[in-house]
Amino acid sequence: MSLPHAVTTALQHQQHQKQLQESSSDAWTNKCVDYVERIIRFYRTNDMSHLTPQMIMLINTIRDLCVESHPISVNVVKRFDSDENLIKHYSRLRKELGGSEVAENIFQPSFVYNVLPSYAQKFYNKGAENVSGDSVSEAAHELGEALQYQIAEAVASNTPIPLPVRHQLVNTYITLLLQRANIPPNVQDAVSSRKYPTLNIINDLINNVIDDVFTGVYGNYYYYVLNEKNRARIVTLKENIGFLAPLSASTDIFQYIANLATRAGKRPSLFQGATFLNAPSSNGSNVEQNRTSCQQSLTELAFQNEALRRYIFQKLSYKQNY
């Protein structure tokens, strides 16, 4: 093979490789652009039919990362100064964007009567033996409203229906606690992850009650959750301790008992704080711990507001412009 021919072959091979790389790069770029267009279409039209489960999971991941790294500011500015202005805004949208009439009931009474007669009779028939027409109509209306809101919430939270996974998880957790049953590993992982706001509320409430009862940090506010027996026992306990020691020394019962034990000769253990044993080995979880409850509540309210906004837009049935 002559040198010029070898050089030509090498150049052709190099050019072919470059074309393949450009083609691959163009395909990847087109794929990214298409995906972005699908996301934009999803937010504009509430249509999830063109999204695969993997795409929905990626959208959820991006949303969670944004919420975790940039939670909603406590000093969030309201778009409307008053509820009246908000109502006027949606009234204007109804006039400008309102399309065809939307049926009030997405479930026809005949469907409820033929498929779910027991549902209408149990919850809407007021104890009567036979199902009445009014009960069927009311059941159809309530089911329609519930499903329409679930659709809006599903789109706002990027979670396809059925939604009640977290609600079932919360109910299971509460039932297990009340029955003093073994907590399954998956439920323990869900609690430890602190990704489920309602689970966090349950555990935070229990810990707040303990803090308030034994340290008075919340000014006895959580006495409301105690029954009469436990409330009387706690009040009596604090009165007895207050009788034995000055108020300033007995406010924190934990510290007061620890001081008494130390005076009696008990030596502090090496791992005195239980939090030391459970402390994470890295600082990765400190971001979640540093988020205030106000920021968490505002973030949750933002998603609820988005669900309500989409619910209202569903009611408008406006003409979509692409």
From Swiss-Prot:
Main location: virion
Single GO molecular function: structural molecule activity
UniProt keywords, alphabetically: Glycoprotein, Late protein, Virion
Glycosylation: residue positions: 130, 283, 290
InterPro entries found in the cross-reference section: Baculovirus_Gp41
Pfam families documented for this protein: Baculo_gp41
Signal peptide range: none
Compartment(s) of residence: Virion
Cellular component, GO annotation: virion component
Similarity field: Belongs to the baculoviridae gp41 family.
Protein's name in the database: Structural glycoprotein p40
Species annotation: Heliothis zea nuclear polyhedrosis virus
